[in-house]
Swiss-Prot record:
InterPro entries: GPCR_2, GPCR_2-like_7TM, GPCR_2_extracell_dom_sf, GPCR_2_extracellular_dom, GPCR_2_secretin-like, GPCR_2_secretin-like_CS, GPCR_2_VIP_rcpt_1. GO terms for cellular component: plasma membrane. The lineage of its organism: Eukaryota, Metazoa, Chordata, Craniata, Vertebrata. Residues 129-135, 203-216, 281-305, 358-447 are cytoplasmic. GO terms for molecular function: G protein-coupled peptide receptor activity; peptide hormone binding; vasoactive intestinal polypeptide receptor activity. The gene is vipr1. Gene3D superfamilies: GPCR, family 2, extracellular hormone receptor domain, Rhodopsin 7-helix transmembrane proteins. This is a receptor for VIP. The activity of this receptor is mediated by G proteins which activate adenylyl cyclase. Coiled coil: none annotated. Residues 1-103, 156-178, 239-256, 326-337 are extracellular. It comes from Carassius auratus (Goldfish). This is Vasoactive intestinal polypeptide receptor.
């Protein structure tokens, strides 16, 4: 909304500068709140195109406005007639409001689901040390980029709706509003760059013979977070010095500065499609190679399935709409770009975490361990080495096989088979004594 107000103010200022020196015996050039009219002689009929800012209200704004210069001045036009001539549909306002409200609800739900699923995925990967590896670190950075994207959407909506309600801010174009848009654009670009990092990592894993994951990891961080920083800073400086209009949230097809953001994203998608083809070719060769073990081949296949699915899934919609003007197929663009795009974070979490075999196995292992500790007591440990003050060293190993359903446990008919082995070795001077005890009773502390 601020961009529309500022664009109207800019058109008014240009009109006043253009018509300031015009002297005529007929009608003087002027700005009539809607459009700029040139000077004309009495009896002259003037036809001008609809102002360019009507493109914000309608896809069909290429109409004309007309006035006649009379002895009493310009003929008056009803503002509603002007709106109709310039393609503004008065009957469609309610339907448009309902559509935009539905779109906002749709992408709010999508980003909320993505935010919850991505946060859960990060917690799962962080809690288990067995899942700490370069591959999952890259996944977590990708998760964080989509989390920041969802947060940026919520913050942007809150700020822009406040700006619409307070039209006084439109004249000043607050720095906070622009900062939110800059952060929003950064998060979008970062999500594409980290998807590119996923493709680069998988390609390096398959193609490089001696692949140092730790060495390459810092380069991946530089690409994923540093690359968007450079381009977004360049775009921000360009907007601030050459096109500082409104809150920077309106994207015009004629805005050349917008390509500072579009070009890197398109380049990352193009690189991912090239990697897509190369990975398929290398993967086919490795799977068919007899020197590659079955387990290693399955590992390549599982990682490739997720990455190769995400590359076309996230790239096609951006490429389709990148070269289409913003005012064409607005409804279709909003549905694909906002609603479907808002669920991308959820898809990432499902493919890289929830459907990951290693993650599922680790969750099952922790669940069984928690279930066993809950049955035996909170102080029970699988292995508990202790060192006494007299030099005794004990190692206790507990193995329990439990076959007990909840119903039988409540009926107190649970049968447990417990095998307890206590291995103790005591050293006194030059003598050694070994003792092995087996039983079916509770383990007590040995001192």
């Amino acid at each position: 909304m601020c961009d529309v107000v500022n664009e109207i103010e800019l058109a008014r200022a240009r009109c006043e500068n253009k018509t300031a020196g015009n002297v005529t015996s007929g009608c003087k050039g002027m700005w009539d709140i809607i459009a700029c009219w040139p000077s004309a002689k009495v009896g002259e009929h003037v036809v001008i195109p609809c102002p360019n800012y009507f493109r914000h209200f309608s896809d069909h704004h290429e109409g004309n406005l007309s006035k006649t210069c009379t002895a009493d001045g310009w003929t008056e036009m009803d503002p509603m007639e002007i709106a109709v001539y310039c393609g503004y549909n008065l009957n469609g306002t309610v339907d448009d409001d309902s559509f935009f409200r539905s779109v906002k609800i749709g992408y709010t739900i999508g980003h909320s689901v993505s935010l919850i699923s991505l946060t859960t995925a990060i917690v799962i990967l962080c809690m288990s040390r067995k899942l700490h590896c370069t591959r999952n670190y890259i996944h977590m950075h990708l998760f964080v980029s989509f989390i920041l994207k969802a947060i940026a959407v919520f913050v942007k909506d809150a700020v822009l709706y406040d700006v619409i309600q307070e039209s006084d801010n439109c004249s000043t174009a607050s720095v906070g509003c622009k900062a939110v848009i800059v952060f929003f654009q950064y998060c979008i670009m970062a999500s594409f760059f980290w998807l590119l990092v996923e493709g680069l990592y998988l390609h390096a894993l398959l193609a490089v013979s001696f692949f140092s994951e730790r060495k390459y990891f810092w380069w991946y961080i530089l690409i994923g977070w540093g690359g968007p920083t450079i381009f977004i800073m360049a775009w921000s400086f360009a907007k601030a010095y050459f096109n500082d209009v409104g809150c920077w949230d309106i994207i015009e097809n004629s805005d050349l500065f917008w390509w500072i953001i579009k070009t890197p994203i398109l380049a990352s998608i193009l690189m991912n499609f090239i990697l897509f083809i190369c990975i398929i070719r290398i993967l086919r060769q490795k799977i068919n190679c007899p020197d590659i073990g079955r387990n290693e081949s399955n590992q390549y296949s599982r990682l490739a399935k997720s990455t190769l699915l995400l590359i076309p899934l996230f790239g096609i919609n951006f490429i389709i709409f990148a070269f289409i003007p913003e005012n064409i197929k607005t409804e279709l663009r909003l549905v694909f770009d906002l609603i479907l795009g808002s669920f991308q974070g959820f898809v990432v979490a499902v493919l890289y975490c929830f459907l990951n075999g290693e993650v599922q196995a680790e969750i099952k292992r922790k669940w069984r361990r928690w279930h066993l500790e809950r049955f035996l007591g909170p102080d029970t440990k699988y292995q508990h080495p202790s060192m006494g003050s007299n030099g005794n060293n004990f190692s206790t190993q507990i193995s329990m096989l439990t076959r007990c359903s909840p119903k039988t446990r409540r009926a107190s008919t649970c049968q447990d088979e417990t095998s307890i082995t206590v291995l103790g070795s005591t050293t006194m001077g030059y003598g050694h004594q070994n003792e092995t005890v087996k039983g079916h009773e509770d383990v007590r502390e040995v001192s």
